[in-house]
Design a protein with these regions (language model features):
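NTP-dependent small-molecule kinase module
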Residues: 23-25, 142-214
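Walker A/P-loop
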Residues: 18
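ATP-dependent small-molecule kinase phosphotransfer cores
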Residues: 40-114
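A glycine- and Lys/Arg-enriched "phosphate-lid" helix/loop adjacent to the NTP-binding pocket
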Residues: 103-168
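P-loop (Walker A) phosphate-binding loop of NTP-binding proteins
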Residues: 12
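ATP-binding Walker
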Residues: 15
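Hydrophobic anchor at the beta1->P-loop junction of P-loop NTPases
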Residues: 9
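Post-Walker A helix-loop "phosphate-sensing" segment adjacent to the P-loop in P-loop NTPases
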Residues: 26-36
Length: 214
């Protein structure tokens, strides 16, 4: 392959995505795969300014303001696509913690189809594999509440909003054909499913060159 394999993991809050990422990384590295772990939030040099807009949006929901948030996030992903993803080894597997699929969960006014087009128009890198991590909303809400950092969400304030977020994300996942991992059992079970899907994608692409995907 002429570039890294790009895998994005997204989902609502509290679904165990970070723990799953760590477990997937460990299994792939044990199989002598070169794994690069990235985080959209930590890779985004403009996140501070964007979060100021998000905070305004939470206090005063407005379509134009949410659209501006979506545009800024898409601009950031374009920057990450150009300045971070292109710097990774060609023989690696990039696992990123959140990418544009997460907008399906957290943006409540602008339709996801419109958000997706914003990202496509900016040549944001399209993952070779979109992994949507989900649980029943009540399970992820309880998990998030039990964490040391709690829900740690700017945009969600109650279970009802979290249920809506979960339903919206699962609907987008079905519409877009993302690989859905229901993380309600053991971490080993979920890890095995995702690693198996990553290996299937690798095997499908192996043997012929894959160029830049846009």
């Amino acid at each position: 392959m002429t570039r890294p394999l790009f895998v994005a993991l997204d989902g609502p809050k509290g679904v165990g995505k970070t723990s799953l990422l760590e477990a997937i990384t460990e299994v792939l590295r044990a199989d002598n795969q070169k794994v690069i772990r990235l985080c959209e939030k930590k890779s985004d040099p403009f996140r501070g300014e964007t979060m100021q807009l998000v905070n305004r949006l939470v206090r005063h929901p407005d379509r134009n303001l949410e659209l501006e948030v979506c545009q800024r996030l898409a601009d950031s992903r374009r920057w990450i696509s150009q300045h971070v993803l292109t710097k990774q080894p060609a023989d690696s597997i990039i696992l990123i913690d959140r990418w544009y699929p997460s907008d399906a969960a957290f943006r409540r006014i602008v339709p996801f189809a419109e958000i997706l087009q914003l990202n496509i128009d900016r040549n944001v890198q399209v993952p070779d594999l979109h992994v949507g991590v989900v649980t029943a909303a009540e399970i992820s809400w309880a998990r998030a509440g039990a964490r040391r950092r709690g829900l740690s969400s700017t945009v969600l304030r109650g279970l009802e909003e979290h249920v809506a977020c979960t339903e919206a994300f699962e609907l987008a996942a079905a519409d877009q054909g993302w690989f859905l991992c229901r993380n309600e059992g053991t971490i080993e079970e979920a890890t095995g499913r995702v690693v198996g899907e990553i290996n299937r994608v690798v095997n499908r692409l192996r043997g012929h060159s894959i160029g830049p995907r846009r």
